């Protein structure tokens, strides 16, 4: 088992891994509440004939690259059923703080990623209460208020 590190240190170590060849399928049931996520990731890679990540950086890079790849796959499915071209992906909640993953996502999806708000659920709740109280008229006004109140970070594909 690897020692505990802060998320910024983990991102830094993952950034230093240039050639990741280990990927997981994040939706696989084996990743739902395992006793050890690290051991489960390593076993998954072993079972699927991939190099087994050992270091913090290798494991985090495997996770981030796998998530970005999955986002791209799901975006492809959505494009099949959408009548409009999807040109921007919005990431909200805690994941919106992860600069490295957001950039990997922009690169994997080939589109702009807008990250934020971090507290999307709470802001949505406040806006619904404002609507119920008659303080806002519609969803467009709610979106304008939120957009004017928070910082949204923009990530463009680099590949």
Regions of interest found by a model, annotated:
Residues 94:
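Glycine-rich Rossmann-fold phosphate-binding loop(s) that bind the pyrophosphate
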Residues 1-88, 97-121, 127-158:
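Active-site core segments that coordinate phosphate-bearing ligands/cofactors
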């Amino acid at each position: 088992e690897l020692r505990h590190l802060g998320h910024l240190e983990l991102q830094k170590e993952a950034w230093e891994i240039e050639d990741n060849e280990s990927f997981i399928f994040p939706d696989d049931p084996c990743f739902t509440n395992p006793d050890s996520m690290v051991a489960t990731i390593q076993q998954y890679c072993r079972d699927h004939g991939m190099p087994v990540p050992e270091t913090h950086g290798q494991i985090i890079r495997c996770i981030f690259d796998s998530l970005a790849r999955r986002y791209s796959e799901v975006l492809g499915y959505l494009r099949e059923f959408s009548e409009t071209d999807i040109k921007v992906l919005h990431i909200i909640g805690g994941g919106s703080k992860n600069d490295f993953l957001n950039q990997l996502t922009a690169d994997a999806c080939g589109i702009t990623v807008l990250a934020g708000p971090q507290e999307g659920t709470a802001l949505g709740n406040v806006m619904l209460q404002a609507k119920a109280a008659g303080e806002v008229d519609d969803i467009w006004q709610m979106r304008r208020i939120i957009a004017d109140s928070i910082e949204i970070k923009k990530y463009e594909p680099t590949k």
